[in-house]
């Protein structure tokens, strides 16, 4: 389909800033709806190698399948079927939760090189002339009946709405705040401007295959202030990350930056840390193909939009990689925004592109997505601190509750995944498993109560632990 054909079918024009997973997925969604759009990417290429990888869970997989893309991704990595967990006292346990998730939903959990994800999204995109690289955005101008985005080379792109899919260092977020401060002082709160904080850093790496790390399995190795998580391909790569607690908490944008030397230094400091019985961090580093180190911002904004500007993905909610939901949450954002834009595009030109219509749409977008994104963010935050044994409570929960809470963890995972958002105007695949029908997207998620429910489970275990220690002391 040519660009002209898209324009004939929809007068609505969307400017997407950021050739990210969120941005390119939104472009695919809009192409399916014949909504005119353009993608502006500041880098010279869409898919650079940065050493990072992405976990795709059933909630993200279902959206990619709606777009006809999932088979391309599934072929890149064997599904995860077994999780192995290791604690510093030598205790280990295994869980087939990933296999059960696949059986219930019809989609496995897979981990893929982020470069490959972006490459596939771009190569399968039908209107490549709509994706422009070397387009660093300098400012956004509100035009009353539209909006204009000006890039570093002096080009101006006009549309009805600007979507900031440009990540944690979002230029569009900065412009949204600037314009709101100029026109409606106080609308953007100081809390939102300081919403992103950093307490952890992470070394992401991709290594050559190590024989003792079996394909289709992944390992979580926990310690105090540190965790290492690996995913193992078949005759291929090992994806891994080392997450470490930093000495002090900082607030974005005054957060640390790290070099390749920093990544090497961290991995050298933890070289003897055991990932498994036979593999240490030094083995992952010695066999690495690429690696990078980054600060891990965490936070979620209370205001996602202003006027004709809206944020999605990491530009509005940022989480650690511990529960693998960052990219999946961005995919859900894209699916909901595209569904609302599709509905809007069916109105008359005047009604569909008016300031009132845009404000109503963006209000609905945030109200639809906020609670679920906030719950996912909070669960990720809790997961990072559970995995790094951040305090006594989380240490005890991780060691004495988590290994024995399999059915409850499964139940909560199923409910969370089954209530995920999707593209409303595209059909589902026949491969959908039975779990999707067990809950509707209108069912309230319970993710936000994770710490309280875990504490309730912990108390009996804690009393038993103390009783055992007391008996041991008395008998000695």
Swiss-Prot record:
FAD binds at residues 41, 55, 114, 314, 327. Its cofactor is FAD. InterPro entries: FAD-bd, FAD/NAD-bd_sf, FAD_mOase_fung. It is found in: Membrane. The chain crosses the membrane at residues 447-467. One of its GO terms (cellular component) is membrane. It is an enzyme of class 1 (oxidoreductase). Keywords: FAD, Flavoprotein, Glycoprotein, Membrane, Monooxygenase, Oxidoreductase, Transmembrane, Transmembrane helix. It is a single-pass membrane protein. GO terms for biological process: terpenoid biosynthetic process. The keyword Coiled coil does not apply. Pathway: Secondary metabolite biosynthesis; terpenoid biosynthesis. GO terms for molecular function: FAD binding; monooxygenase activity. Its EC number is 1.-.-.-. Belongs to the paxM FAD-dependent monooxygenase family. FAD-dependent monooxygenase; part of the gene cluster that mediates the biosynthesis of paraherquonin, a meroterpenoid with a unique, highly congested hexacyclic molecular architecture. The first step of the pathway is the synthesis of 3,5-dimethylorsellinic acid (DMOA) by the polyketide synthase prhL. This is FAD-dependent monooxygenase prhF. The gene is prhF.
